[in-house]
Amino acid sequence: MALWGGRFTQAADQRFKQFNDSLRFDYRLAEQDIVGSVAWSKALVTVGVLTADEQRQLEEALNVLLEEVRANPQQILQSDAEDIHSWVEGKLIDKVGQLGKKLHTGRSRNDQVATDLKLWCKETVRELLTANRQLQSALVETAQANQDAVMPGYTHLQRAQPVTFAHWCLAYVEMLARDESRLQDTLKRLDVSPLGCGALAGTAYEIDREQLAGWLGFTSATRNSLDSVSDRDHVLELLSDAAIGMVHLSRFAEDLIFFNSGEAGFVELSDRVTSGSSLMPQKKNPDALELIRGKCGRVQGALTGMMMTLKGLPLAYNKDMQEDKEGLFDALDTWLDCLHMAALVLDGIQVKRLRCQDAAQQGYANATELADYLVAKGVPFREAHHIVGEAVVEAIRQGKPLEALPLADLQKFSRVIGDDVYPILSLQSCLDKRAAKGGVSPQQVAQAIDDARARLAL
């Protein structure tokens, strides 16, 4: 059933209908459309369009339809309705007859779909927040179990300074906490109801839109009808949140792919999140992580595509806006799936402590400690930096770590170096000295874990 037709003397070309119809994807808004329709029926009572008995009949029929949709949402796709609004109205008329045709009084599909999408976004944001916090919790638990797992930290993919696997986990907790904050901020801005704004100029019925917003669970009603039906900022914000969040998950995946590689060998992934090769029987491939990394691109594409769709649109509603849903649905589905998969990867991960420690002791990751030692002895840092560089060259020539060079060899580069240098060059000393807030010292890492556990109520 089309919701328009009196103006037209010819039927739509079937090819145009297929091109124009959106039911194949906006069917996901069925529950929201029904909930919004129940609220709208109540509003129509307040302005005398419906009697209380008529509203009761409509609400009862809509609630029955809601249960039918929840039991089998795929039934919607068997219809040739133009969109979810047409489908809901058609089903309502099937149930209550002519009375169902009164429901759309004073309402446009423009404010209707804007309301439906915001309701869907609110529910989805709550799911994303839950999944985000579950992944933060998994990272904190993994950090708790691996506080003593010393490993090399990297810059430019070169071994730089020793850190711990726990400190690495907590870095991603921080990223996810920012993602959580962005979602909460987005939720505040989208939590305003456009229902009652009509096609663009507002409704001709004196409906209390603030009351209507409250019935739907919004904090308030929007202030300008033109903006309300054309606003898709919340779509852009959520896509931006997803794009940033997926970048974080992609980096997480890339790190673990490297840590899991034969070249690093710092971790082993569970059989539950890996796959094999059809040719090479020895392979154990990190497919879950590679897919997280790969799916990042489609989310970035959804954001870029939506920005390009909106950039040239005049006020108010244009059919271009129908393109807001597929990219949004796919991007947020993808983000949610990847959050869950990242937590599953952590659930069975094994950290190979000895291999991590061996790697941390290689690559002269304690060179900065020697420079700091010289500074403490009164050598200017820039000069100390040069001295240590020369000492590293000598250690490489001898095929030894810095701490294995004889004192006499070290003193060739600076006479201030004494026997007290060797404890300074140990891995534990490297960690212990990073005791400022946010550092990698055991005390700071333990405090960061405690703080995260308190924030997440673990």
Swiss-Prot record:
Keywords: Amino-acid biosynthesis, Arginine biosynthesis, Cytoplasm, Lyase. SUPFAM superfamilies: L-aspartase-like (SSF48557). Belongs to the lyase 1 family. Argininosuccinate lyase subfamily. It comes from Salmonella schwarzengrund (strain CVM19633). GO terms for molecular function: argininosuccinate lyase activity. The gene is argH. One of its GO terms (cellular component) is cytosol. InterPro entries: Arg_succ_lyase_C, Argininosuccinate_lyase, Fumarase/histidase_N, Fumarate_lyase_CS, Fumarate_lyase_fam, Fumarate_lyase_N, L-Aspartase-like. The lineage of its organism: Bacteria, Pseudomonadati, Pseudomonadota, Gammaproteobacteria, Enterobacterales. This is Argininosuccinate lyase. It holds the Pfam family Lyase_1. PANTHER family: ARGININOSUCCINATE LYASE. It is an enzyme of class 4 (lyase).
